[in-house]
Every structure is written in C-alpha cells, then in structure tokens.
C-alpha cells in the first residue's frame, strides 16, 4: 500500500471525522462523519475535475472555487441535537434542546435554507442580528417546523422592532432580545402601534469571559447586554406595566470560540442564577428558555488543547453535557423548572461543510539576502555584540532610551532571523503563487491572523519536499500566507509538474464567516461556488450547482460605475478614434464577463 502523507498536514486531528486521504493519495470528504462507509467518501480531485470540465456551451468554472458539501451540514445538525438529547437523557433534565443558526455566520441562500430544511425535525431555527438578516430568516422559517425560534439580537431601531413584530403576526416564533434597557421602550411603542404582543428576552452581560481575541466582547466591559441588576430593573418595569408575561428568555454569549468546558459550565451556571432569580425573586413565571449563545468551537489546529484561539479541548458531547449539567444543578438548587435550552452554534455547524480550492500558478525560490546567508553562530555573535552596547553610557536619559530602543529592535530582527535560520536551515523556501485573494477568500487570516488547516488535494502518496509560503494575485504586500497551524511559517508542498495536471491546495474549515466578511481589494471578488451531494457507494456524487464567481462587470458595478456608460462606451469612443475597436471590443467583452482571477495559466516546470 502506498505511503499516506496526510499526517504531515495533521488531517487526523482537525479533519476528524470528515476529512481523510484515500488510497489514491487524494483528499476525500467523509460526508457522514464516522458513519461514512468504505467507498462512500467523495474524492475532492474528482469533484474539481468535473466542476471545471466545459459544459455544453464550452464554458467552464474558473478558480478559485468553494466546494460545499451539504451532507456534512446535515450531519453536523443531527450530531449537535444527538449530543444534547443524550446529555438530557443521562442527567434526567426536565426539558428539551432547541437551537438556532446565526444567519451572520454564512448568509448564503443555500446554506441558510439547508439549515432550516435539515433541522426541521429538531425545530431548528435562525438568529438574526440586523434587518436584512431578519428578512432572510422570516422567509426561510416559513418552511420550518412550527415553533422554531427566530431570535432577534443586535441593536434595534423602531423599524427593526416593527419588522420583528410583523414576523410574529405571521405566526413565526419571534423573540426580541433586548441588548439595552432603552430598547424596551421601542418594543412597547411599536407593539402598541401595531397591536401585536411581543415575546421578549434580555441579554445578560456575565462576569465569566474567555481569554484571547474571541473573548473581547464578553465580561463586564463587553459590548453587548445588561448586567444582572439592570435585567432585574427590566423585570420591575414590565411588572409595573402589567407586561411581565412578555419576558420569556434569558440570553448570554461569552465568545465565539470557548476553549474549554470549564468555562462553558461556569458561564451556564452564572446565567442560570440570573434565570432562577427572575423566576423566584421577581415573579417572572413565564420564563421558558435559556439561550446560551454561541461559543461551541472548532479545533482548527487539531491539537484538542484549548490553549489558543485556534483550538478547543472538547467535542459536541462534552459541550452539551457541560451546559445541561450546569443548568440542571442550579435550577434544582433554586427549585425552578428546567428551561428549554437554546444555543446559537454557527461556527461549529457551518465550518466543516465548505472548503476553498486554490490553484497553484507557479513556485519561485525565495531569494536570500546577505543576512539570511549568515550562519547560526554568526547571528548569535551579532546578538551578543548588540547586547554589549546596551550598557549604561554617559548619554542623557532620553538619548539612552532611544539608544536602547534602536538596538532592541535590531536584536528582535536578528532573533527572528535566527529562529527562521534554525527552522529552515538547509531548506530553500518557495513562494507558491496562488490564484487567490487573501482579502476576498480568507479575510479572517488577514484581519485577525486566524489560521486555517491547508493541504494539497492530490499527490498525498508522495512526500512533499518543498517548504512553501503562499502569495496571492493582489498588488498588496499583505496578500500572502506565511503562518500556518501548529505555529509554523511554511507548509510542505510538492514541486509543480505540468505533466501531472493542475496542483490544488485546499483551505479547510472555512464555511463560517469567510464569505460574509469577504472584501474586494483590487476588485478581486468572490469565488466560483460548487454544491456537491453524495449519491451512495463508490464515491458517487452529483454537482447540483456550479456558479461562476463574481465577474469583472459585476465588481466594477459595485463601486458606483455604470459599466455601459462609464466604461464600455468611453473605451469604445477612444478605440474607434484610433481605429482599433474591432480588436478592443472582443477583449473588453471577454474581460467584463469573466472573473478577474487568472484563467488558463500554465505553470512552468520547476527545477
């Protein structure tokens, strides 16, 4: 049997249970998770080849592209509900779990509609944080099981509240969650105008928070929600208005990636105390639901350590068990009926079902400058020399501070070079030019240094011999990928060989937030989209939809140009003056109606 080099990319860690390397050395998708039978895996290279083959009109999809596997979405939803069902049964919890998918995580029509469709039997609902998202949710939830939640979060004006009340009048189970005390006045006013009685919740600002980037909006200094004493003020105000029965839900959110279950347990316990106080001390006997927000994380680096923003130290079962046990213990202690449990788990539901496919254009050895040629011992010597210059001198204090800063920066740079020298000694680093815009396809990498697992789609039965960084096609020095999971500055790739066909790198676990946050730097836009559904054994699949990414004409139109009037007509006029319109017309038409990324590029052979 051929050697499998999937372990070089740690696929057995972050990829469990959906990704593996098959006998042909290709990345494959196990669409049913651990229940995927031998032969049911979908070969990613086969999908790419089918998606890029010309159709009856001679047209074919361009790179980059996103592959969606909706079967994985279905499996994620079922797995989440199974985890909560098992925890509820094991602990003899006295209520049920009923979750929602936050539309902000991936607003694409197919994804949101799939979430509602696949979650129908579980009364799976949606969460909206703005008026556009609310309209999407209102439409999609007309196909949901009656009673599915439509949770309305985010800051609200009168129009938002009125729209939410209209959705309630349509028979949807809408809950307006107060982020600020002032929003209650808006709800009261709009309810009176429309004659629609609302159901409201309130967001708690907990003291529990998580470390790192994803915990920055939690804790007492968090952006959203009310501290416990303000929540009780809301209850008092509702009671004075004889509207206490409106209040039915308590919501909290401590961060998008909770690293460990002890924080999950602590947050659920703290929120349960507030929930129980509302019922027992403030007489809100209509309370029914505890919404535990997001935070169910994804183990992007596959370490299962929870030691960074890229990792969580638990799975679905441990997460569900922590919430159920924490809430049960507090409610039993206070003598309060167990509430319906809701979570807004978006990242963990959507991440696995989607991957970005990048096409390698060329690979060029990174040139070494004089300092890069320095030996490790020479670099050590330079650092020692700089250290000796940091001793106190007769300079003034301010001059001495400038002196220390200057040499400190030099030492830092040399230290970085020393570190790189140690890790890449005797290895040339190659810059792989990819048909990619980091800003459009991987905005979280560029914006918050979020790392995603990456690996070649094929040749995984060959040892990758090149240490590589990835550079994109934008005219921006930030358009590169030189940080990878497991804290490395290169990733192993194979030499490019045109005789073997295209060489593709998959960026995985990208189904959450990347499309929503995408931008158009250099007017490189969105990728082609391919929807892939398994059809049974033998790795059979159907490409249900294959959509070309944003064309140049569409992208130019987004920045206030009238393409016909401001672009085509102006170019035509000048081209006719120079008697070259016959040539220019074809090129302009082709340029406008294709994606701005490179097409039909043939990489040169590598030495």
UniProtKB/Swiss-Prot annotation:
It is an enzyme of class 4 (lyase). GO terms for biological process: arginine catabolic process; putrescine biosynthetic process; spermidine biosynthetic process. It comes from the Eukaryota. Keywords: Decarboxylase, Lyase, Magnesium, Putrescine biosynthesis, Pyridoxal phosphate, Spermidine biosynthesis. It holds the Pfam family Orn_Arg_deC_N. NCBIfam families: PRK05354.1 (NF003763). This is Arginine decarboxylase. It comes from Avena sativa (Oat).
């Amino acid at each position: 049997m051929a050697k499998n080099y999937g372990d070089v990319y740690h696929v057995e860690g972050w990829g469990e249970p959906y990704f593996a390397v098959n006998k042909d050395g290709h990345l494959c998708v196990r669409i049913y998770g651990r229940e995927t039978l031998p032969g049911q895996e979908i070969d990613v290279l086969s999908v790419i080849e089918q998606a890029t083959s010309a159709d009856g009109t001679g047209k074919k999809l361009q790179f980059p592209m996103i592959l969606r596997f909706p079967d994985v979405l279905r499996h994620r939803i079922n797995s989440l509900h199974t985890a909560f069902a098992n925890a509820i049964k094991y602990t003899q919890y006295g209520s049920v779990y009923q979750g929602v998918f936050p539309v902000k995580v991936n607003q694409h029509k197919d994804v949101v509609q799939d979430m509602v469709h696949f979650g129908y039997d579980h009364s799976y609902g949606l969460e909206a944080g703005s008026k556009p998202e609310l309209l999407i949710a209102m439409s999609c939830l007309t196909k949901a099981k009656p009673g599915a939640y439509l949770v309305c979060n985010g800051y609200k004006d009168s129009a938002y509240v009125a729209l939410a009340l209209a959705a309630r009048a349509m028979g949807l189970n809408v809950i307006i969650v107060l982020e600020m005390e002032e929003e209650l006045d808006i709800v009261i006013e709009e309810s009176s105008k429309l004659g629609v009685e609302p159901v409201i919740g309130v967001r708690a600002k907990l003291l529990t928070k998580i470390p790192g980037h994803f915990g920055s909006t939690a804790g007492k200094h968090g952006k959203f929600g009310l501290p416990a004493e303000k929540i009780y003020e809301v209850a008092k105000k509702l009671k004075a208005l004889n509207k206490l029965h409106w209040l039915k839900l308590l919501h909290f959110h401590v961060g998008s990636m909770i690293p460990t279950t002890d924080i999950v347990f602590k947050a659920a316990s703290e929120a349960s105390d507030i929930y129980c106080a509302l019922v027992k001390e403030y007489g809100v006997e209509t309370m029914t639901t505890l919404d535990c927000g997001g935070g169910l994380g994804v183990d992007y680096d596959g370490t299962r350590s929870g030691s960074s923003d890229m990792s969580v130290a638990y799975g679905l079962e441990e997460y569900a068990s922590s919430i159920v046990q924490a809430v049960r213990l507090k409610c039993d202690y206070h003598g309060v009926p167990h509430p319906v449990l809701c979570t807004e788990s978006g990242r963990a539901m959507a991440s696995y079902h989607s991957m970005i496919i990048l096409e390698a254009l060329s690979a060029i050895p990174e040139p070494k400058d004089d300092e890069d040629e320095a030996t490790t011992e020479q670099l050590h010597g330079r650092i020692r020399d700089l250290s000796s210059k940091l001793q106190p001198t007769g300079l003034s204090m301010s001059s001495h501070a400038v002196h220390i800063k200057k040499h400190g920066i030099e030492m830092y740079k040399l230290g970085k070079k020393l570190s790189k020298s140690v890790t890449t000694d005797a290895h040339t680093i190659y810059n792989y030019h990819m048909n990619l815009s980091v800003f459009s396809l991987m905005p979280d990498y560029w914006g918050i240094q979020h790392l995603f697992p990456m690996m070649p789609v094929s040749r995984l039965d060959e040892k990758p011999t090149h240490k590589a960084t990835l550079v994109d096609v934008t005219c921006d020095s930030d358009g590169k990928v030189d940080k990878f999971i497991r804290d490395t500055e290169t990733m192993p790739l194979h030499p490019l060989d045109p005789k073997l066909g295209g060489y593709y790198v998959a960026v995985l676990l990208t189904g959450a937030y990347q499309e929503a946050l995408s931008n158009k730097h250099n007017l490189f836009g969105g990728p082609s989209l391919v929807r892939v559904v398994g059809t049974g054994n033998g790795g059979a699949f159907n490409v249900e939809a294959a959509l070309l990414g944003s064309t140049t004409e569409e992208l130019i139109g987004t920045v206030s140009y009238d393409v016909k009037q401001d672009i085509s007509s102006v170019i035509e006029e000048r081209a006719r003056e120079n008697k070259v319109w016959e040539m220019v017309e074809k090129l302009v038409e082709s340029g406008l109606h294709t994606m701005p990324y490179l097409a039909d590029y043939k990489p040169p052979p590598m030495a």
